[in-house]
């Protein structure tokens, strides 16, 4: 079943409603990280170039559903888009019963989560949204894993439902990385907890040639290998699970390497003193916050030989520079690699920005949870809806 692409449609004079993922951090009314906004611009610009009257909607943050809260208003996003686009951009706060929008203009709807029924994919709300447009464009890969009114229901009731260029690119890149990858396929999975990424680790361990774990996840694997992890964040109840994943990888001729050296401190703080230790020398009072240089070099070598690289999650607490060298080395190795590389997840994108490698990564995914669910092998509800409407 083919998905209809926005780029193939005649949008002249049409009311086009685009669901983007504009969920960006805002501080004192100003957007502090604009990666998702930048990613959405080509879609909005294409709709304008095709002669459409453009409406854009998104969620921002986690407000109480159905209640207006100025802290989660889309106004800072409107201010950003007004500077980035060469046209009128305005905010519509009361839009469900109809909104005036002219060709060549962009109207941004107030936070979709201010609407009661958004998260439950309420049918009445979905139909009201669908009635606002001639063409609905799903372009928010970051929320494609949620069946909500603005990402799923509206598409079922709109006259035409299609994928925007950003979503189409995401699906193509992920397919290239996982469906028919150039091998060896190396996956780097970081983050704080095994429990949140267990299904990802299980799914990937069956298809990758080499699985690398980092961050708090690695601590559980270090403990599973019989080493002391001191006061580090780890999950004792998942040690057997970690052992099983390692055994599975080894039975396929791969491995999940455990760091040989680590960077530790006595407290979690931006000023904590970093100490390098062999992994078997971690004391009861230590907390592991990064991999050491030997481990980082070993991982860099694995990355150098890869044909395809999937990166989701840092290997240390890179927000603090003294615990960022491991992630920095991984980032450099990915940047230097000739392999097809795809990076996704909020913390990963922050690392890509910090180490300035965005132009060296083949594809940067805007999705967090959606990226993970795709890695788990699940069909995303928004994609299922688009396939249904394209049939």
Curated annotation (Swiss-Prot):
- Which positions does UniProt annotate for ATP binding? 197, 319, 345-348
Q: Which major enzyme category is it?
A: transferase
Q: Which parts of the sequence bind substrate?
A: 21-23, 36, 59-62, 113, 146
Q: Which pathway does it operate in?
A: Carbohydrate degradation; glycolysis; pyruvate from D-glyceraldehyde 3-phosphate: step 2/5
Stretches assigned to coiled coil: none
- Write down the EC number: 2.7.2.3
Q: Which UniProt keywords apply?
A: ATP-binding, Cytoplasm, Glycolysis, Kinase, Nucleotide-binding, Transferase
Subcellular location, principal: cytoplasm
Q: What subcellular locations does the record give?
A: Cytoplasm
In this UniProt entry, which cysteines form S-S bonds? none
Catalyzed reactions per annotation: (2R)-3-phosphoglycerate + ATP = (2R)-3-phospho-glyceroyl phosphate + ADP
Q: Name one GO molecular function term.
A: ATP binding
Into which family does the record put it?
Answer: Belongs to the phosphoglycerate kinase family.
Q: This chain belongs to which protein, by name?
A: Phosphoglycerate kinase
Name the source organism: Shewanella sp. (strain MR-4)
Gene that this sequence comes from: pgk
């Amino acid at each position: 079943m083919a998905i209809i692409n926005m780029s193939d449609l005649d949008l002249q004079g049409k009311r086009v409603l685009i669901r983007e993922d504009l969920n960006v951090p805002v501080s004192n009314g100003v957007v502090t990280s604009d990666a998702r906004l930048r990613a959405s611009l080509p879609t909005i610009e294409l709709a304008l170039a095709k002669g459409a009257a453009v409406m854009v909607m998104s969620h921002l943050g986690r407000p109480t559903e159905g209640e207006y809260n100025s802290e989660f208003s889309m106004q800072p996003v409107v201010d950003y888009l007004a500077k980035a686009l060469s046209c009128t951009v305005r905010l519509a706060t009361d839009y469900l019963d109809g909104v005036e929008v002219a060709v060549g203009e962009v109207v941004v709807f107030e936070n979709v989560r201010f609407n009661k029924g958004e998260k439950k994919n309420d049918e009445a709300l979905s139909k009201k949204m669908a009635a606002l447009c001639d063409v609905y464009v799903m372009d928010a890969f970051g929320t494609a894993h949620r069946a909500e009114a603005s990402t799923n229901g509206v598409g079922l009731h709109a006259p035409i439902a299609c994928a925007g260029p950003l979503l189409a690119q995401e699906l193509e890149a992920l397919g290239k990385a996982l469906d028919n990858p150039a091998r060896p396929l190396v996956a780097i999975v970081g983050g704080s907890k095994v429990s949140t990424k267990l299904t990802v680790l299980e799914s990937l361990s069956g298809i990758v040639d080499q699985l690398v774990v980092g961050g708090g996840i690695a601590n559980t694997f270090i403990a599973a290998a019989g080493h002391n992890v001191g006061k580090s964040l780890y999950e004792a109840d998942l040690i057997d699970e970690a052992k099983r994943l390692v055994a599975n990888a080894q039975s396929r001729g791969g491995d999940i390497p455990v760091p040989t050296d680590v960077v530790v401190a006595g407290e979690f703080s931006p000023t904590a003193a970093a100490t390098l230790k062999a992994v078997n020398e971690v004391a009861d009072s230590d907390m592991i916050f990064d991999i050491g240089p030997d481990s980082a070099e070993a991982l860099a070598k694995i990355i150098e030989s890869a044909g395809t690289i999937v990166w989701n999650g840092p290997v240390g607490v890179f927000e603090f520079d003294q615990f960022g060298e491991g992630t920095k080395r991984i980032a450099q190795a990915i940047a230097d690699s000739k392999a097809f590389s795809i990076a996704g997840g909020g913390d990963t994108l922050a690392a890509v920005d910090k180490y300035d490698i965005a132009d060296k990564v083949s594809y940067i995914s805007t999705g967090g949870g959606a990226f993970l669910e795709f890695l788990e092998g699940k069909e995303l509800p928004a994609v299922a809806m688009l396939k249904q409407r394209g049939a």
